[in-house]
Amino acid sequence: HQEARRQRQMCIRDRSGAIVANGSLRQVKAAFDYGYNMGLAFQIIDDIMDYSSSKTKMGKNQGDDFKLGKTTLPIILAWEKSNKLEREFFLKSLQELKQEKGDFEKCCEILKKYSILNRCKKIANDFVIKAINALNEFSENDYKKALIELANNSLSRDN
């Protein structure tokens, strides 16, 4: 999947930077951990945006993941909370791709009913905290501050 590839690229890039800078093994691992956790947070925010952002903000159509039948974190968490009828709806809409007009809106209603997007934001925030904590292996400098700022800003991005 493209999401997994993006996450691996972030990990490799961040780990490579520590290696090139002659970082200790702990710093190389910390750089990997930063990239890994940022990749997860970034993907979760992207998943949230599919159900909450407009095309002008996001650069892609709202509901594209739903229309393609992608099982993203919001769908997984909604499935866990859903009753029998809601699960049947998800199976029809996402697994069988038998979607009707209004199904995306129905999905959004289910997500809202169970506060799924808020739960996803909390999970993304937890990954951002892990990413920032990984930077404790590095001394205070402008680069570290920029990485922390990037991590914090990733939670409020809208594209």
Predicted regions and their residues:
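Active-site alpha-helical segments that house and flank conserved acidic catalytic motifs
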Residues: 18, 28-56, 71, 75, ...
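Short helix-capping/linker segments at secondary-structure and domain boundaries
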Residues: 18-25, 80-88, 158-159
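Short hairpin/turn module used for nucleic-acid contact or packing/dimerization
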Residues: 117-159
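Amphipathic, well-ordered alpha-helical segments in soluble domains
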Residues: 10-13, 44, 100-103, 127-130
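Alpha-helical transmembrane segments of multipass membrane proteins
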Residues: 15-20, 134
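Single conserved hydrophobic/aromatic residue that forms the stacking wall/gate
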Residues: 1-12
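Acidic/histidine metal-binding catalytic segments
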Residues: 25-28, 84-90, 139-150
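Divalent-cation-assisted or electrostatically stabilized phosphate/pyrophosphate-binding catalytic cores
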Residues: 5-6, 29-33, 55-81, 87-126
